[in-house]
Amino acid sequence: MSPVSPRSLTLIGAGLAGCLLAILLSRRGWQITVYERRGDPRIKGYECGRSINLALAERGRHALRQAGAEELVMAKAVMMRGRMVHPLVGEPQLQRYGRDDSEVIWSIHRAALNVALLDLAEQAGARVHFYRRLHTVDFDAGYARFIDDRDDQPHEIHFQSLIGSDGAGSALRAAMQRKSPLGERTEFLDHSYKELEIPPLPGGGFRIEGNALHIWPRGRYMFIALPNDGGTFTVTLFLPNAGEPSFATTRNGDEAFALFARDFPDALPLIPQLKQHWEEHPPGLLGTLTLDRWHLDGRALLIGDAAHAMVPFHGQGMNCAFEDCVALADQLDAHDDLASAFAAFEAARRDDAGAIQQMALENYLEMRDRVDDPEFLLQRQLEQQLQARWPTRFVPHYTMVTFLRTRYSIALARSEIQREILVEATRGHSDLSRLDWAALETIVHARLEPLDGAH
């Protein structure tokens, strides 16, 4: 049994959020111990059930700065200026995310980021134990039992409080549910995903534009590619579970090859191992997790995907989890007891987590159905014009979510107003030449207050 220190916390899960939280709290004087069910990725290679490449935005970078980790992480990241949209017929077109290269996002491979944060967590003083799968928890006595799956040996610890940073399939959440129901609900999409890879050129370098997120939108399904710093692309096909085409009708490598030849012909020669990878990589599920509460008084708390998992279509799951880490560290500084800190953390983050979950679902429809739609493209043009004219009032949705740290709930509310303005102003128009700009100025000033941080 391990003794408990006065200012100690036990983290379950040494993934991205767990490692970042360990850095932040260790630097603030907490004694942090982390338990991870898998092995050390620095020794045995990286294993992860969900390895979609990560899009690092300003929210995530801000959290990394707080932890002194930004410089190390950014050395491994690749800039993405926008979406490179590949139509079925015609040339790819770049849709910029922002106004210039100061408004971009960054692609980073999950494994590289996890290893970097793990190193920094240990350097900050956190102790990390691998091959420790949470088995049972006695919340009243403050004891937890872990199992080493290599030899089935149990390991018991005494804890002051547990923080669940162990992802959407959280073992701590399951233990909390057994103690006191959390009102857990998971809504799965009727789509799943499969991950593939575009290798680098024989001499190194990218086979397609390296500073973009590539999208092949095809209505009810799509294919995306995110760059890595080694010249590869991590590519992901999102496909319905039933219907035509779907995972039900694309069961093997030959059927996958036929699908790509028909619907993604320019991508097919980029993926020489398509058939092999298709049969080796099982489809991954996509879902949104909601809970009625995230904590068990001061004894346990869930953060990140363990509390509010979301679909990956806004590139904000990691960024949101990193914001959680900073918010929790701040609440622990502000309160003398854990129960108050946990309650304040949940109160501060709940509405924002729900908002980004909703926006992530909406962004899937945009990426899949609308990026090549003429009405949507006209609205994008108007959005850029309105931002240029009134940059502190009409702040594009993507800017608020990705380049600023506007609260997600505020970004959602403002985005809904702005969408109404764009739809109404462009209705019946094929271009912007006949718009009533004076009327638009009145509407924008009446409905949108200046936004903090916008420029």
Swiss-Prot record:
SUPFAM superfamilies: FAD/NAD(P)-binding domain. It catalyses: L-kynurenine + NADPH + O2 + H(+) = 3-hydroxy-L-kynurenine + NADP(+) + H2O. GO terms for biological process: anthranilate metabolic process; kynurenine metabolic process; L-tryptophan catabolic process; NAD biosynthetic process; quinolinate biosynthetic process. Pathway: Cofactor biosynthesis; NAD(+) biosynthesis; quinolinate from L-kynurenine: step 1/3. Pfam families: FAD_binding_3. It is an enzyme of class 1 (oxidoreductase). Its cofactor is FAD. The keyword Protein biosynthesis does not apply. It comes from the Bacteria. One of its GO terms (molecular function) is FAD binding. Its EC number is 1.14.13.9. Keywords: FAD, Flavoprotein, Monooxygenase, NADP, Oxidoreductase, Pyridine nucleotide biosynthesis. Belongs to the aromatic-ring hydroxylase family. KMO subfamily. Catalyzes the hydroxylation of L-kynurenine (L-Kyn) to form 3-hydroxy-L-kynurenine (L-3OHKyn). Required for synthesis of quinolinic acid. HAMAP family: Kynurenine_monooxygenase. This is Kynurenine 3-monooxygenase. The gene is kmo.
